[in-house]
Swiss-Prot record:
Known regulation of activity: Allosterically activated by HslU binding.
SUPFAM superfamilies listed in its UniProt record: N-terminal nucleophile aminohydrolases (Ntn hydrolases) (SSF56235)
Catalytic activity: ATP-dependent cleavage of peptide bonds with broad specificity
One Pfam family cited in the UniProt record for this chain: Proteasome
Enzyme nomenclature, EC number: 3.4.25.2
Organism of derivation: Solibacter usitatus (strain Ellin6076)
Known role: Protease subunit of a proteasome-like degradation complex believed to be a general protein degrading machinery.
UniProt entry keywords in alphabetical sequence: Allosteric enzyme, Cytoplasm, Hydrolase, Metal-binding, Protease, Sodium, Threonine protease
UniProt GO cellular component terms: HslUV protease complex; proteasome core complex
Protein name (database record): ATP-dependent protease subunit HslV
Record family assignment: Belongs to the peptidase T1B family. HslV subfamily.
Length: 179
């Protein structure tokens, strides 16, 4: 029986025309931390698009490659690219078995993309994936609704809280920003 690789928390928050995405660095197999400094975020399409993943690293890299091809094909049109990626991911016999979730964002939109064909744009400009995603989402939602903190500070605090609660999330956090 194959043990499941568990990881991570990746979050994206939009506020005041700024987009901040962050991901922790922990990769866990069973009860063992395999790596504490994994990089789960990428800048794509001439640094105009942020992307993060949760799930299998090899699968995520395969998806990043496909997604970059879609961005080139559709001249950086994020919404069209994510819809086409989701369609291909769901219908392709090989891609269908990939185990990962993607968060992608530009200055106008943020999307969660899954292999089930889901393309979700969050209502409040907050979305998080991975085992710590629900904790980070809850913290970010409370901070966005009740404070004037910047998107960066909201993401920092949300990742800190997720790392304190989720055993598959650490405090070694990488950030990417767009304005």
């Amino acid at each position: 029986m194959r043990e499941k690789i568990r990881s991570t928390t990746v979050i994206c928050v939009r506020r005041d025309n700024k987009v901040v995405m962050a991901g922790d660095g922990q990769v866990t197999l069973g009860g063992e931390v395999l790596k504490s400094s994994a990089r789960k975020l990428r800048r794509l399409y001439n640094d105009k698009i942020l992307a993060g993943f949760a799930g299998s690293t090899a699968d995520a890299f395969a998806l990043f490659s496909r997604f970059e091809s879609k961005l080139e094909q559709f001249n950086g049109n994020l919404s069209r690219s994510v819809v086409e990626l989701a369609k291909e991911w769901r219908t392709d016999r090989v891609l269908r078995h990939l185990e990962a979730l993607l968060l992608v964002s530009d200055t106008k939109s943020t999307y969660l993309v899954s292999g089930n064909g889901d393309v979700i744009e969050p209502d409040e400009g907050i979305v998080a994936i991975g085992s710590g995603g629900p904790f980070a989402t809850a913290a970010a939602t409370a901070l966005l609704r009740n404070t004037k903190l910047s998107a960066r500070r909201i993401v920092e605090e949300s990742m800190k809280i997720a790392g304190e609660i989720c055993i598959y999330t650490n405090q070694n956090v990488t950030f990417e920003e767009l304005e």
